[in-house]
Amino acid sequence: MSIFVLVMKERTRKRIIIWFWILFALPIVGVTALVISVVKFAQIPSFEELEHPNNNLATRLISSDGVVISTFHIENRTYVSYEDISPNVIHAAVATEDARFYNHSGVDFQSLGRVLFKTLLMRDSSQGGGSTITQQLAKTLYPREELLTGFPGAKYVSMVWIKMKEWVTAVKLERNYTKEEIVAMYLNSIFYGSGAYGIKAASETFFGKEPCELNIQEAALLVGAVNKPTRYNAALHPEAAKTRRDFVISQMAKAGYISESDKVLAQNSPIELNYSVQDHNSGLAPYFRDMIRKEMSASKPKRSQYLYEDEYVADTIRWAQDDLYGWLNKNTKPNGEKYNLDRDGLKIYVTINSRMQRYAEEAVQEQLSKNLQPLFTREMRSRRLPPYPNDIDTTTYNTLMKQARKWSERYRVGRKEGLSEKEIMAQFSKPVKMRVFAWNEKGYVDTVMTPNDSIKYCKSILRASFMAIEPSTGEVRAYVGGPSYKYFKYDNVRQGKRQVGSTVKPFLYTLAMQEGMTPCDKVVNMPQTFKVNDETWTPRSTDRADYIGKTVTLKWGLTHSSNNISAYLMKQFGPAAMAKMMRKMGIKSHFDEVYSLCVGPADLTLCEMVSAFNTFPSKGVYSDPLFVTRIEDNDGNVLAEFANKHTEAISDRTAYLMVNLMEGVIDHGTGVRLRNKYKLKGEIGGKTGTTNDNSDGWFIGYTPKITAGVWVGGEDRMVHFKQLALGSGSNMALPVWGIFMQKCLKDPYLDISELDTFDAPVGMNLDLSCTGGDIETEENADEFFGRTSDEGDDFFN
C-alpha cells in the first residue's frame, strides 16, 4: 500500500473523529456542561421552595351551614388532594398532555425526539407536545425569567437556559413528590378559563360540582380547555370546545383508560353546563364579603380619620378588644410575613346561613323590583327635575349634580389624564354607550345616554338594606347592603347612617320599663312642650284630633307610635338618660342628646339598630354582631377563633315587657300588615319608622329565633316618594321582612317556627292585657289612623 493511500486513510479517520465530536460528542458535552452550569449558577428552586411551592390559593368563605359562599382571590384557586379528583380527570390529563407520564423522571427524551421528528417533520400532533406534565408544573409554579437581550442570538441562548432550568426543576420535583402528588399539583395549578384556576374552581364554575364528581365528558372538556382556555371555553365557543373534548376522549381510549363503547357514548353526549363565573361582584352575600375584607384589613384607628371623638374612641376600643378588626395587621405567618387574603388559601368560617342569605336577597329584590321601583318611576314622570321632588330649587339641584359628577369615576379619570375642569364637565353632556343597572334577568341594560343622565338614572334607583341576627348567639345570618353590589358598592348596613324616625322610640320605652313603669301604665294623650334656650318646641302630634286629651296606656302609645306619649316619657327621663340607654344597647354612632331624640332625628346604621333590638328577644342581653367564628389555614390548622361578647344591657323583666309592648305594634298598630297581608302567625315584636318627607322607611322585627331589620330609601335624602302611603316604613321596609320570614318559615332546614314563644322571666306574674283606658290598646289600626293600615306610618317633626 502506497504512502499516499495510508496518509489519505489517516486523514479520513481524523475527519470522522472530528465530525463525530461535532455531531455527537460536543453536543453531549455541551449539554452536560450547560446542565452543570444551570444546577450550579441558575436560581433553581430550593428544597424548601419545592416543598412549599408559591401558588396563589383563594381564601374561602364558608357559611354556618357548610356552603362555600365565595372566595377572595387573585387567581380563583382552591387546592384539592389527589383522592378528591375524579380518575376521569387524571386519565384525561395524562392521555392528552403526557402519555408516558408514569415512565419518565421529569424529562421524557423519547417525547422530545418525537417532537423533533414525528411532530415537526411528519406533522402528527396526536401524541401532544414535548413538555411533560412535570415540566409544565415547573413552569407554572416557578415562572420563567425575562429573556436576555443585547447580543446576537441572546433570545435563543435565553430560551435554552430557561428550558434547562425547567428540566432540572422537573427532575427535582420528581425526586420530592410522588406521581400522584405531581399530577394533583398540576391540575390544581393550571388555568381553565373564565377566571378558574385549578380543577376545583373549574368544576364549580362550569358544572357546579366537586372535582370528584366529574364524568368522562366533563373531565375531557376541562382538560381540553387547558391548551387554549379562551378558544376552547365551552361557555363562549361550544362547537370548538366539543371538538377539543372529543379529541381528549379519543386520547383516553387510545391510552386504554376507557373502552371503545365509553368513548362513543361520551363523544355523542351534548355539552351540559351549569355555568357560573365566580367573581367579586357576583355570588351570594357580596356586601357581606366586602365588609369582611375591609374588617380584616383595617388599620389601627387614627384620630384624624374621624369627625367625632366618640366614634374614634369606640373604634379604638374595638381595635383592642375585637380580634377580627384588623386581623391581617395584627397577625403574621410562621415566617413573619403578613397573611394575604388573596393568596394564602385561608378558610374563613362566617356566621351567614346560605339559605337565609338567599331568602334575604330575594326579598329585597322582590320588593324593590316588583313593587317600589315601578311606583317610584311612575311618580318621577311628573317631576320637573327628576328624581328630585318638584319643590327642589335649581341651585340645590345643580349643587347635587355637580357633587355627583365630581365623585364619579369619569371625573377621576379625567383629572388623572390632565384634563381641565371645563373639558371634563363637557364630557358629561356627550351621549356615549354604557351599561347601567336594571331590574331584569341580566341585571343590566346596554344603552346610549349622557353621563349626566346616567347620574340621574342611578340616583333614581331606590336602595335597601337588610340584616338578620340569631338572638341566642348574636351571629349574623343574613346581610344585604344594597340592590346590586356590582353597580352600587355602598354598604347601607354598616356604612350608611340614616335618620331612624320612630324606630328610636323603643329605647325610650325601654328606659321607662327599666325605671319601673309597665305597658299598662296610663297617661293623658296631650302635646308636650319643651323649653330649649329660651325657645319652645312641641313635637307635632300624629294622633287623631278626637283622641287628644284621652287617657291611654303606654302600650297604646307605642302601638300607634304616638309622638305625644314619646314626648311625655322624654319629659320624665330626659335626653341624657335616653342616650345612656341607647349606648348600653350597643348604639355607637354619634348623636345629639337633645329632646327631639324622642322622635328620631339620630343618624344610625341598620347594623346598630338590629343589634340593639336583638336585646329584647335575648332577654336583656346585648351581643355585638358576630360575623366570623374561626379562621383556618389551607391545611385546616386553626389560626383564630372568635366568640361573641355578651353584656346584660337591661333586665330580663324589662326585655319581656318590651316584647309585649312591641307585639302590640304587630297585632294592632303600624306593623299589622304582617298579620293581614303576609299571614304571619306566632309571636312577633317590631317597630316601623318613617322620617320627614318619607326619605327613610324602617322596620325592625323579631321572633324568638330571629331578629331582622330593613331600611329603604334613596341614595340622596331628597330622593323619596311624595305620598306617605307609598313612602312609609310600613309600605317600603316592612314587606321585605314579611317576604323573608315567609320563606324562612317554609324551609324545613331552618330552626324557625310559628310555634316559637317568648318565655316570661321566672316568677313574673303581671297582667299585660292593659284594659280600662279611655281608648283600648287593641283598637283597630285602621280606625286609629283614619285610613287603611297599609297606607301610612308614624313620622317625626
Tell what function each PLM region has.
Residues 2-62, 100, 120, 371:
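N-terminal type II signal-anchor transmembrane helix
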Residues 56-58, 62-265, 269-319, 327, ...:
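Peptidoglycan glycan-strand catalytic modules in the bacterial/periplasmic cell-wall system
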Residues 93-94, 247, 252, 360, ...:
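Active-site SXXK
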Residues 102-112, 197-200, 259-264, 513-534, ...:
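Short, well-structured active-site flanking segments
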Residues 132-133, 140-147, 152-159, 352, ...:
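Active-site-adjacent helix/loop patches that line small-molecule binding or acyl-intermediate pockets
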Residues 259-419:
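Non-catalytic structural connector segments
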Residues 270, 495-551, 624-639:
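Short, glycine/proline-biased beta-turn/loop segments that scaffold the active-site neighborhood
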Residues 286, 350, 354-370, 403-470, ...:
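A penicillin-recognizing enzyme superfamily signal
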